[in-house]
């Protein structure tokens, strides 16, 4: 009976966090609008081999993540939930692997359930796991690969070991097809300390080739298909998207070595109080094979991405699966022996909630700021933000009432965030980061446009997805579409600032021409170097400029 109650509670938890509130949040640009539009175009064109964005070749990532996103929009429609359905599914599958792996290690159902709940409620997991990017997919394949490797190394028969390594190769292959060759490097680095300490080199060398074969066979059909269709894909993807992004001096998203320290700290909320103890207990218990495996799985990718020049918070998502297991194991021991860490965790959550309440007041219309984040007419959004932090502090307090039994309720600290964040985003943010909001405000003007030009790829993708058209033209800036725009058949999909006046004269009689520009909040529109327009409609950071036939 208790197991049934736990399962009902888990399903209610998943529904409140990962299902019910998702449609209330508009898509963010540039990431969510980009991936939404790529998958929409894949469904519209029926081309499941070559990814396209705005009708242009888009070689930044391989294909598998787009497949999953496309299936999400196919099943649930071109809406906010449909766009995010794939990442939510991947996150829940990863949580299922956390459950299975914990049961495999300790045969303890309560520990497995707690590890799962901790994983799903970690701030970084929730933030990325409900955000339409490819990282939840690669995290799933990496976690599946680590589970497969453990399964292979614990098998007692050659059939079991062979099956485990074959499965490892398939997961690595799908990882390569999702985000590239990092799906090969990360698992290898993660298992090496464990293999070395356990002296399991023999099994690795005897059966490892099976993983290589199954990985190659997994990637080969699509790899050959895209090489035939687009011969330069692999050169661009390997050199630009791997070497330049991570290793060279001009790498994308450059950040210092310590970049991930605050990411791990913030990402560990609402379980931050367990982080030091979980890592220390894992190190102290390093003679235990499973603990070494979890510790290595957590630390090695973190070090690898810290050394790389290019860094983003999403890169280390897979590290939090083993960390959640370590946290759950440590928390149960602390509840029995010394609940100090659990009390500290409760106080951290109270402090975070109270700090958020104060910060919300400071940036509200009633605070001391001359330019508040929310305007007076958005008072309901301020109260939503207050509710988010109040619930966080309340559940932090509740865990302290009987800490040995109530500490798991820290998982409910982000409940307000999950349910209300979509209602608390300030209009000034929505106007710049949510193209759907802009489209809703300007739908009547945009819909009849013969040509639409914009200077932002993220906005262009948002316009394309919302209006169900892929012929948006880039104006002045090419951004990440630079490579695709270099192809001969992409001629006419970019107009520079100097060419715009002539281009306008040539095309004006064909129909309404709409220019959507991103501007600074205090920028004077009249100072823009563009021909006089028939219509100007400013929505804070985005402005619609329209030219009608003469």
UniProtKB/Swiss-Prot annotation:
GO terms for biological process: lipid A biosynthetic process; lipopolysaccharide biosynthetic process; protein O-linked glycosylation; response to iron(III) ion. GO terms for molecular function: 4-amino-4-deoxy-L-arabinose transferase activity; mannosyltransferase activity. Pfam families: PMT (PF02366). The chain crosses the membrane at residues 7-27, 81-101, 111-133, 137-154, 165-185, 204-224, 263-283, 288-308, 315-335, 346-366, 382-402, 406-426. It is an enzyme of class 2 (transferase). Signal peptide: none annotated. Keywords: Cell inner membrane, Cell membrane, Glycosyltransferase, Lipid A biosynthesis, Lipid biosynthesis, Lipid metabolism, Lipopolysaccharide biosynthesis, Membrane, Transferase, Transmembrane, Transmembrane helix. It catalyses: 4-amino-4-deoxy-alpha-L-arabinopyranosyl di-trans,octa-cis-undecaprenyl phosphate + lipid IVA = lipid IIA + di-trans,octa-cis-undecaprenyl phosphate. PANTHER family: MANNOSYLTRANSFERASE YKCB-RELATED, UNDECAPRENYL PHOSPHATE-ALPHA-4-AMINO-4-DEOXY-L-ARABINOSE ARABINOSYL TRANSFERASE. NCBIfam families: PRK13279.1. Catalyzes the transfer of the L-Ara4N moiety of the glycolipid undecaprenyl phosphate-alpha-L-Ara4N to lipid A. The modified arabinose is attached to lipid A and is required for resistance to polymyxin and cationic antimicrobial peptides. This is Undecaprenyl phosphate-alpha-4-amino-4-deoxy-L-arabinose arabinosyl transferase.
């Amino acid at each position: 009976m208790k197991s049934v109650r736990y399962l009902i509670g888990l399903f209610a938890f998943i529904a409140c966090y990962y299902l019910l509130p998702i449609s209330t949040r508009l898509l963010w640009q540039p990431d969510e609008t980009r991936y939404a539009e790529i998958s929409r175009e894949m469904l519209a064109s029926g081309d499941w081999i070559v990814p396209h964005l705005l009708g242009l070749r888009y070689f930044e990532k391989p294909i598998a993540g787009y497949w999953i996103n496309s299936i999400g929009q196919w099943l649930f429609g071109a809406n906010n939930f449909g766009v995010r359905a794939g990442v939510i599914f991947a996150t829940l599958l990863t949580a299922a692997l956390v459950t299975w792996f914990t049961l495999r290690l300790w045969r303890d159902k309560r520990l497995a359930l707690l590890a799962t709940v901790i994983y799903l409620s970690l701030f970084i997991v929730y933030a990325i796991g409900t955000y339409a990017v490819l990282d939840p997919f690669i995290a799933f394949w990496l976690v599946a690969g680590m589970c497969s490797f453990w399964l292979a190394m614990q098998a007692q028969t050659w059939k079991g070991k062979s099956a485990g390594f074959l499965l490892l190769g398939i997961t690595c292959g799908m990882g390569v097809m999702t985000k590239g060759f990092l799906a090969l490097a990360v698992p290898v680095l993660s298992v090496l300390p464990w293999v070395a300490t356990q002296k399991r080199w023999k099994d690795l060398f005897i059966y490892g080739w099976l993983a290589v074969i199954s990985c190659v066979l997994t990637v080969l059909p699509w790899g050959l298909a895209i090489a035939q269709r687009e011969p330069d894909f692999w050169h661009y993807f390997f050199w630009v998207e791997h070497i330049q992004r991570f290793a060279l001096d001009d790498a994308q998203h450059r950040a210092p070595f310590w970049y991930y320290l605050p990411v791990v700290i913030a990402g560990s909320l609402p379980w931050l109080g367990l982080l030091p103890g979980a890592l220390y207990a894992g190190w102290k218990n390093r003679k235990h094979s499973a603990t070494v495996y979890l510790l290595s799985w957590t630390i090695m990718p973190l070090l690898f991405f810290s050394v790389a020049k290019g860094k983003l918070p999403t890169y280390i998502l897979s590290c939090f699966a083993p960390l959640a297991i370590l946290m759950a194991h440590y928390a149960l021991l602390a509840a029995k022996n010394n609940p100090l860490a659990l009390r500290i965790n409760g106080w951290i959550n109270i402090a975070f909630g109270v700090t958020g309440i104060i910060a919300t007041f400071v940036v509200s219309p009633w605070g001391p700021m001359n330019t508040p984040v929310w305007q007076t007419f958005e008072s309901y959004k301020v109260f939503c933000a207050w509710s988010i932090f109040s619930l966080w502090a309340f559940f932090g307090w509740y865990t302290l009432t009987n800490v040995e039994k109530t500490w798991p309720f820290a998982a409910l600290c982000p409940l307000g965030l999950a349910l209300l964040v979509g209602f608390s985003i300030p209009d000034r943010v929505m106007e710049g980061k949510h193209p759907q909001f802009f489209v809703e405000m300007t739908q009547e003007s945009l819909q009849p446009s013969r040509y639409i030009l914009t200077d932002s790829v993220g906005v262009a993708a948002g316009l394309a997805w919302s209006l169900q058209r892929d012929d948006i033209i880039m104006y002045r800036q090419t951004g990440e579409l630079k490579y695709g725009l270099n192809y001969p058949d992409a001629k006419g999909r970019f107009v520079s600032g100097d060419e715009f006046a002539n281009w306008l004269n040539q095309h004006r009689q064909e129909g309404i021409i709409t220019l959507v520009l991103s501007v600074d909040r205090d920028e004077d529109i009249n100072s823009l170097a563009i021909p006089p327009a028939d219509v100007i409609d400013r929505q804070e950071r985005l402005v619609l400029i329209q030219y009608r036939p003469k």
